[in-house]
C-alpha cells in the first residue's frame, strides 16, 4: 500500500524485518515498506533481519543495509534460513526432491533456534549465505527479474479450478479476485508463488 506507516518504539525494543528472498534480494514490497515506514522514538535500538531462501541470499545484506541507512537506521544483525525451494515460475526452476526438502526443514529448526538466541542477546553479527557469484545474481539478474517477471499477465486458471478462493485469500497484496468462480489478477503483483503453492491441485499455471 502506498501510504505512510508509523510505529512508536520503546527504549529497549527490538526492531526486526522478516522476509523471503526474491531473486537474490529483498522483495520490492519489503523495500517499499521500509521507505514508507517511520519509527517514532528511534534511538539506535537493536535492529535485525531474518530472510528465508531456497539456496543463497546474494547481496541481500548490502541491499537492506543501504535501504535502512537511507532512513538513518543502523542494522545490527542479519540471518538467513535455508528453506525448500518453491519457485517454479521459470524454466529450469523446480521444487526440491523430498529428501532435500526434509533435510532443509530439519536444519532450519536448529538454525532458527540459534538465531533466536542471538537476537535475545542482541548480538551484532551477520550470518547470511551469499552463495556463488552474488554480485551477478543481485546486481544483474535481480533488476531483470523485477522488470520482466513482476507481472501477472502470464497467469491463468485451468479447468480444474473450482472457485475455492484460496488464491484470493492467500495473496499478500490482495491482487487476486475471484469473479464468477474464476480468479482475476490485478496489476499489483509481486510474482510470488503463494497462490500456486496453497492449492491442492495445480489449477493455476504460468506460461
Show which residues each predicted segment covers:
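Conserved small/polar residues in nucleotide/adenosyl-binding loops
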Residues: 197-203
Amino acid at each position: 500500500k502506498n501510504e505512510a506507516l508509523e510505529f512508536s518504539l520503546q527504549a529497549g525494543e527490538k526492531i526486526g524485518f522478516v522476509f523471503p528472498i526474491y531473486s537474490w534480494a529483498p522483495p520490492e514490497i519489503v523495500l517499499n515498506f521500509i521507505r514508507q515506514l517511520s519509527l517514532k522514538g528511534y534511538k539506535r535500538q537493536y535492529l535485525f533481519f531474518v530472510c528465508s531462501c531456497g539456496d543463497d541470499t546474494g547481496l541481500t545484506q548490502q541491499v537492506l543495509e543501504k535501504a535502512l541507512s537511507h532512513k538513518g537506521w543502523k542494522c545490527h544483525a542479519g540471518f538467513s534460513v535455508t528453506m525448500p525451494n518453491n519457485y517454479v515460475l521459470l524454466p529450469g526452476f523446480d521444487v526440491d526432491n523430498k529428501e532435500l526438502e526434509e533435510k532443509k526443514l530439519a536444519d532450519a529448526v536448529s538454525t532458527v533456534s540459534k538465531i533466536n538466541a542471538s537476537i535475545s542477546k542482541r548480538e551484532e553479527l551477520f550470518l547470511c549465505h551469499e552463495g556463488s557469484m552474488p554480485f551477478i545474481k543481485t546486481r544483474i539478474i535481480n533488476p531483470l527479474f523485477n522488470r520482466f517477471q513482476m507481472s501477472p499477465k502470464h497467469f491463468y486458471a485451468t479447468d480444474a479450478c473450482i472457485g475455492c478462493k484460496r488464491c484470493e485469500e492467500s495473496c499478500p497484496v490482495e491482487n487476486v479476485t475471484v469473479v464468477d468462480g474464476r480468479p482475476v489478477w490485478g496489476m499489483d503483483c509481486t510474482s510470488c508463488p503463494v497462490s500456486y503453492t496453497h492449492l491442492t491441485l495445480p489449477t493455476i499455471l504460468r506460461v
